[in-house]
Amino acid sequence: MGKVRFIHHRGKPILFLDFSHCNADEVFKTIDEAKQVIRNQPENSVLTLTDVTNTKYNMKTTQAMKELANGNKPYVKAGAVVGIDGLKKIIYEAVTRFSGRNIPVFDDVEKAKDWLVEQ
């Protein structure tokens, strides 16, 4: 299964961005794939769920994530993220500040999906 794919929850499509357990090279590859999918959708239409569980970040991947979140802003109706812990909280804050997006953090994928389909 691909790292970027549509899943369905309560009959609504959610674009799942699976960065879990990715190293830096895999993060860049997943970002490129996400850009292609998201930016070919109608504006203000995409629900995104991003999983960053055990993802390895560095300065370059952090910058790339900021650019992804900012560039996707016109297309994303709502986004949620799971897997934020430790130092990733600092990266998360940088991404949301840079993009100006409100992307809530959830401890559980199911809760994130429930929230997304209500948006």
Where is each model-derived feature located?
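Amphipathic, Lys/Arg-enriched alpha-helical "gate/interface" segment within cytosolic domains
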Residues: M1-Q119
